[in-house]
């Protein structure tokens, strides 16, 4: 489950960084005279080489539902954090608890359409939590990484919450109206 999660995260981040670099450079960033154009083109194709993000989600969702990462997450949670890192761990623990709730919510539905619709959000949230704990572990080993861990976790919280709210919304309108939306 960790390999497809990692591939999905890395390819999506590569695309976002490349996109942002073009925005930073304005119109000149997309000209062939600059590396930003090549990075953007290469980042877009990386998803195809690695399998689209959706294929990575399909590969990861079974492990997310079956809780394949729980043992590793428990190991990371058992590390002793102090100060800022302890406060960040508490935030991650809260996200993890919500994530387990949302996984159970989807699994208990036994509705394949809802399961498929929420798979990406579940995999993304699993990734936010897992990577957050990894970042804390690394910050524990090297204090220079504390700010990186803090930034990652604080940025992940609203992204996680958005997906969590979507999962828990029990909203079937996209499923119910998919033909009208697709055929529009």
Could you describe each region identified by the protein language model?
Residues 1-184:
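Flavin-dependent oxidoreductase catalytic core characteristic
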């Amino acid at each position: 489950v960790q390999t497809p999660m990692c591939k999905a995260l890395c390819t999506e981040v590569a695309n976002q960084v490349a996109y942002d670099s073009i925005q930073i450079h304005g119109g000149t960033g997309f000209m062939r005279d600059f590396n930003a154009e090549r990075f953007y083109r290469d980042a877009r194709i990386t998803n195809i080489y690695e399998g689209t993000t959706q294929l990575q989600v399909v590969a990861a969702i079974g492990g997310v539902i079956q809780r394949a990462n729980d043992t590793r997450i428990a190991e990371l949670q058992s590390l002793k954090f102090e100060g800022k890192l302890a406060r960040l761990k508490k935030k991650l623990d809260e996200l993890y608890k919500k994530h387990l709730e949302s996984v159970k919510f989807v699994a208990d539905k036994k509705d394949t359409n809802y399961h498929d619709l929420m798979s990406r959000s579940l995999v993304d949230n699993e990734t936010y939590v897992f990577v957050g704990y990894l970042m804390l572990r690394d910050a524990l080993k090297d204090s220079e990484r504390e700010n990186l861990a803090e930034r990652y976790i604080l940025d992940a919280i609203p992204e996680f919450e958005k997906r969590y709210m979507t999962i828990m919304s029990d909203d079937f309108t996209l499923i119910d109206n998919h033909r009208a939306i697709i055929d529009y």
